[in-house]
């Protein structure tokens, strides 16, 4: 039985490097990055830029799943830094996936999409290891926690979650 074709953007990054061994066992793995990915067969080592829609379309052809991890991950980035890769690039990923018939896009979000909640109690005290001021039990953060980004990087991750929802609901990805 043939393996599902899975392409990962940002395979050389921290998360990509961590998942690569398992993904190589289970899937026919491809990568997409600006500089290429170490030790990846050339036909599955797609070089391009998230801002370049056409390079994404070329890479996504015949892929079953795209795992989107590539981003500018600077927590202190300003809007002009985040916009090209984390906003425009992300939309390009989803649109290319739609056009190419990709069945699933997995978006790598971040706790920074809700990180502004750490400014409020009880989370502030927990983060400062000041447990004497924490009333137990308290509600843990989960998928129902209010979106409250901590900086423009967090905004871009919250945006990515919303874009993923749109493409899931209206395009079946």
Model-derived features: positions:
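N-terminal Rossmann NAD(P)H-binding glycine-rich loop of SDR-like oxidoreductase domains
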Residues: 4-26
């Amino acid at each position: 039985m043939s393996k599902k074709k899975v392409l990962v953007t940002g395979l050389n990054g921290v998360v990509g490097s961590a998942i690569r061994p398992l993904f190589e066992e289970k899937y026919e793995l491809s990568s997409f990055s600006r500089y290429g990915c170490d030790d990846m067969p050339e036909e599955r080592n797609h070089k391009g830029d998230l801002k370049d829609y056409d390079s994404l379309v070329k890479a996504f052809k015949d892929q079953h799943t795209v795992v989107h991890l590539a981003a500018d991950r600077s927590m202190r980035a300003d809007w002009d830094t985040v916009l090209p890769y984390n906003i425009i690039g992300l939309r390009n990923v989803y649109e290319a996936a739609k056009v190419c018939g990709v069945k699933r896009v997995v978006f790598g979000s971040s706790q920074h999409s809700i990180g502004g909640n750490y400014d409020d109690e009880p989370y502030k005290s927990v983060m400062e290891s000041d447990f004497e001021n924490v009333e137990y039990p308290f509600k843990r953060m989960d998928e129902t926690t209010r979106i409250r980004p901590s900086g423009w990087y967090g905004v871009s991750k919250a945006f990515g979650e919303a874009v993923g929802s749109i493409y899931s609901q209206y395009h079946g990805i």
